[in-house]
């Protein structure tokens, strides 16, 4: 989560080589593509941008990445219990901006592990620094495309939740196909979410909110947690961001969506 929409810069596949103005590089996953190669080509979990890395962020990346970082390379299935050092539930957050809200949520719920994925190098360094200063052992930072992370590196049913806060709305009609929350993405995410896991999305772009509501409502693997359907009130566990507060002061509407992964009933045996 950030103070603006998530349009992260593509970072180096290895953060030991931190570049303030490096060329964008994207991790190449295996050729096998059960979710469909067309889906991956037109939808990524990020939009590249360039930003400067401060000395403090670079220091955090150099020191802490070997301890709390995960490169999304598509080469292995991650043992989440080994990654976090415990078997507590893991929530995947896609796009976290500078990480302030991620840190606040981790501090408020120490019994839940947060795997925060982004490619914005300054944000990665900032979140690692926050985790160290605030002593938050339940945060791990993943560098790369969350689509590859979901498809190639997370085991089926391994996630207790998914958070997508203020993703790029791609407001132009011809770019709507690039929005993250689409049926194909939800189908992929559903395979990695345990039954009962909650997908929590938030956006201040009303047309995107309506699209999110439509595709989540129509998807057979999810059900709205709001009685009667519709948008959810902002839950107390999601802090108000600075960006969000500024938008609310200007009369902007922020919509939250909370959908639960459905437990499908097994068909009765024949006979």
UniProtKB/Swiss-Prot annotation:
Its EC number is 2.1.1.33. Substrate binds at residues 172, 204, 241-244. GO terms for molecular function: tRNA (guanine(46)-N7)-methyltransferase activity. The active site is at residue 168. S-adenosyl-L-methionine binds at residues 93, 118, 145, 168. Gene3D superfamilies: Vaccinia Virus protein VP39 (3.40.50.150). GO terms for cellular component: tRNA methyltransferase complex. Pfam families: Methyltransf_4. Pathway: tRNA modification; N(7)-methylguanine-tRNA biosynthesis. This is tRNA (guanine-N(7)-)-methyltransferase. It comes from Streptomyces coelicolor (strain ATCC BAA-471 / A3(2) / M145). The lineage of its organism: Bacteria, Bacillati, Actinomycetota, Actinomycetes, Kitasatosporales. The gene is trmB.
């Amino acid at each position: 989560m950030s103070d603006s929409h998530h349009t992260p810069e593509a970072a180096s596949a290895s953060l030991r080589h931190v570049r303030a103005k490096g060329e964008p590089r994207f991790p190449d996953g295996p050729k096998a593509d059960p979710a469909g190669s067309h889906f991956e080509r037109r939808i990524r979990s990020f939009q590249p941008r360039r930003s400067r890395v401060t000395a403090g962020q670079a220091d955090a990346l150099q020191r802490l990445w070997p301890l709390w970082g995960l490169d999304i390379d598509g080469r292995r299935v991650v043992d989440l219990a080994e990654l976090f050092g415990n078997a507590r539930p893991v929530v995947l957050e896609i796009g976290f901006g500078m990480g302030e809200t991620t840190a606040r949520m981790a501090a408020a719920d120490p019994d839940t592990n947060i795997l925060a994925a982004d490619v914005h190098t300054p944000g990665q360094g900032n979140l690692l620094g926050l985790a160290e200063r605030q002593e938050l052992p339940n945060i791990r930072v993943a560098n790369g495309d969350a689509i590859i992370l979901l498809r190639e590196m997370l085991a089926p049913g391994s996630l207790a939740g998914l958070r997508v806060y203020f993703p790029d709305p791609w407001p132009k009609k011809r770019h709507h196909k690039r929005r993250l929350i689409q049926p194909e993405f939800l189908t992929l995410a559903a395979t990695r979410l345990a039954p009962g896991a909650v997908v929590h999305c938030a956006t201040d772009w009303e047309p995107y909110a309506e699209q999110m509501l439509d595709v989540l409502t129509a998807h057979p693997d999810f059900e709205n947690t709001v009685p009667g359907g519709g948008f959810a009130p902002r839950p107390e566990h999601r802090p108000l961001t600075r960006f969000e507060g500024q938008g609310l002061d200007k009369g902007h509407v922020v919509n939250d969506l909370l959908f639960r992964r459905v437990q499908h009933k097994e068909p009765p045996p024949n006979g």
